[in-house]
């Protein structure tokens, strides 16, 4: 089994797991640290393939994480695509009105290489109003903030039909207002900035394993509204930007022409007694480039002591400007989680990926049956 490429991740995680999160006070400043890890292994045990467009992958293949190039290939167990180790630290002033937060993540999908995911300053302007400046997670989806923290998620890997895009972070700033309106708790966030992603994992899946594509999102401007009351929660988001690509492996030295995109997202959640459910919907208008993207997710789960079964369905489809073949596929996922302690859990997940793309599609596609197990921990 090809576990060598994640050996560093496993070894470092094993050393750090026993350590609890901690805080240290020093000359009026408080330093805190914490971490998370996922040790996962999975295997594709059936499916279909189109040899002409496998893009250098040994398919049938299951894509668990588009943004990070998390791909399970046929023929053997793999530990890399979903395994990760993250460390987070922050320093805050004694009055709590100013803080600096950073987070780095080492991923098996990147052969253990660590990337800086967050590095931002927070200033509390009032009891309700907060401003943040630096590198942050782009709030595309409901689970965007926690998508690397396996323990915080009901899945081992989030449904890729929805949680799969070329950019997940941005450099910029946000202004957040939190308040309570009658019996409703809510927040409004306005944010903006830009992001340049070199050697995009997303585009390696589409352009080929040996390709290199750089991505740029500029003029990012978005608004997010979240509300909750009792058992119900809802979230809407709108993000606009310009997008550009540069296919470096083909010798391109400059980015393509800027194309405008507008992203719309809606999330609904319910948590009643032991039952919980979630619906999430995404619409991306990229008619300036190629067309439109649609994705949705429906999930229902049940808590029974330390056990938590979950069933979900996710669908993705395109509508193109021209007569090219649009991409269409969906996945059924069944997950069983067992909480070992208050900060650790094990999971087993079965995914059935059904490809509905018409013949003639030019990138990797096909059906896949995937089984994955994981151990998640926060510390």
Predicted features and spans:
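Outer-membrane beta-barrel pore domains and translocons
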Residues: 36-42, 103-107, 136-138, 191-195, ...
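Outer-membrane beta-barrel proteins
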Residues: 22-26, 87-95, 125-129, 175-181, ...
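Outer-membrane beta-barrel "beta-signal"
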Residues: 175, 363-379
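Detector for outer-membrane/organellar transmembrane beta-barrel domains
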Residues: 94-97, 226-322, 326, 330-331
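Transmembrane beta-strands of outer-membrane beta-barrel proteins
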Residues: 31-39, 98-102, 131-133, 186-190, ...
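Residues that define the transmembrane beta-barrel architecture of outer-membrane proteins
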Residues: 29, 78-85, 113-117, 167-171, ...
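Outer membrane beta-barrel
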Residues: 30, 40, 74-198, 225-229, ...
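Transmembrane beta-strand segments of Gram-negative outer membrane beta-barrel proteins
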Residues: 25-66
């Amino acid at each position: 089994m090809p576990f060598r490429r994640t050996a560093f991740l496993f070894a470092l995680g094993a050393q750090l797991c026993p350590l609890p999160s901690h805080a240290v006070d020093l000359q009026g400043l408080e330093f805190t640290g914490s971490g998370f890890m996922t040790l996962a292994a999975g295997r594709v045990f059936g499916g279909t393939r189109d040899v002409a467009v496998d893009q250098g992958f040994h398919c049938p293949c299951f894509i668990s994480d588009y943004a990070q190039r998390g791909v399970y290939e046929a023929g053997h167990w793999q530990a890399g695509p979903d395994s990760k180790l993250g460390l987070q630290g922050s320093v805050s002033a004694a009055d709590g009105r100013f803080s600096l937060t950073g987070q780095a993540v080492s991923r098996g999908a990147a052969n253990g290489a660590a990337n800086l995911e967050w590095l931002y300053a927070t200033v509390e302007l009032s009891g309700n109003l907060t401003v943040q400046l630096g590198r942050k997670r782009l709030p595309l989806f409901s689970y965007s903030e926690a998508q690397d923290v396996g323990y915080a998620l009901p899945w081992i890997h989030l449904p890729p039909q929805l949680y799969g895009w070329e950019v997940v972070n941005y450099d910029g700033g946000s202004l957040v207002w939190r308040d309570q309106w009658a019996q409703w708790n809510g927040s409004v966030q306005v944010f903006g900035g830009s992001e340049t992603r070199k050697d995009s994992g997303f585009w390696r899946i589409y352009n080929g394993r040996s390709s290199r594509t750089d991505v740029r999102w500029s003029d990012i401007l978005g608004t997010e509204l979240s509300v909750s009351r009792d058992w119900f929660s809802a979230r809407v988001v709108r993000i606009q930007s310009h997008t550009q690509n540069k296919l470096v492996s083909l010798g391109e030295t400059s980015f393509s022409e800027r194309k405008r995109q507008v992203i719309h997202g809606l999330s609904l959640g319910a948590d009643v007694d032991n039952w919980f459910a979630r619906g999430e919907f995404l619409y991306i208008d990229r008619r300036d480039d190629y067309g439109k993207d649609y994705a949705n997710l429906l999930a229902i789960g049940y808590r029974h002591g330390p056990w938590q079964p979950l069933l979900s369905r996710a669908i993705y489809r395109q509508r193109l400007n021209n007569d090219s073949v649009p991409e269409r596929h969906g996945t059924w996922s069944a997950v069983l989680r067992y909480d070992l302690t208050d900060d650790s859990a094990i999971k087993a997940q079965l995914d059935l990926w059904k490809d509905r793309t018409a013949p003639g599609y030019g990138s990797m596609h096909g059906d896949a049956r995937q089984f994955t197990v994981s151990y998640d921990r926060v510390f």
